[in-house]
């Protein structure tokens, strides 16, 4: 069975439209948006593990690189997965406020580019929408492979720069260029964007991710995270994928 066979059944147009509808709440109601995204991510990881191991990941240990305030911790703990979150930004760790005071799992403040974990120490290593926020995304990916046990899963998912959501809160102005979009945001709002081009947001292409994954010799699959199964072919078309694959998933096994 291919690693994506189970998840492909879940990757329907209805799912894609539901996630797209919730995207509009990311800024004004982040709890609603991230709970939906976390539940969908936990289901995706469960499907990928089931396809490769013929059983759900109950009792397995997952390291979430860039885990944020706890939405993902809750979703994975509810699925019976042991959760460890890594987050370098203390503001992000506490962004959800008192609602996550008693959040499940364990949290470590550290950089994804230098994970403070031993080699071969977790069953699953996930990074969701983080690679575009670090200056060396493939160093992050290499670290994820290092800490994952042989036969485990590494799932690195990131926002493609030239896709419609590449600019994050800068909107579509990133098509004018990252520096110009960042300056435009400052003029309009009086302060830099949280995801500020050149410091906390970087231009990461689909081609870069595909080259890195192929170069590791550990790649199992690549697919667009939010697209229905019938649109996955877009990842195989140069140039087109940069604009139409909004989020690329790289699945690897050490």
From Swiss-Prot:
Family annotation (CDD domains): AdoMet_MTases
Domain of life where this protein originates: Bacteria
Which EC class is the enzyme in? Answer: transferase
Could you give a GO molecular-function term held by this entry?
Answer: S-adenosylmethionine-dependent methyltransferase activity
By what name is this protein known?
Uncharacterized methyltransferase Rv0224c
Sorted alphabetically, the keyword list is: Methyltransferase, Transferase
Query: What is one GO biological process annotated to this record?
Result: methylation
The record, for InterPro entries, names: Methyltransf_11 (IPR013216), SAM-dependent_MTases_sf (IPR029063)
Q: State which Enzyme Commission number(s) the record gives.
A: 2.1.1.-
Q: Source species, please?
A: Mycobacterium tuberculosis (strain ATCC 25618 / H37Rv)
Q: Any extra detail in the entry?
A: Was identified as a high-confidence drug target.
User: Which family does the record assign?
Assistant: Belongs to the methyltransferase superfamily.
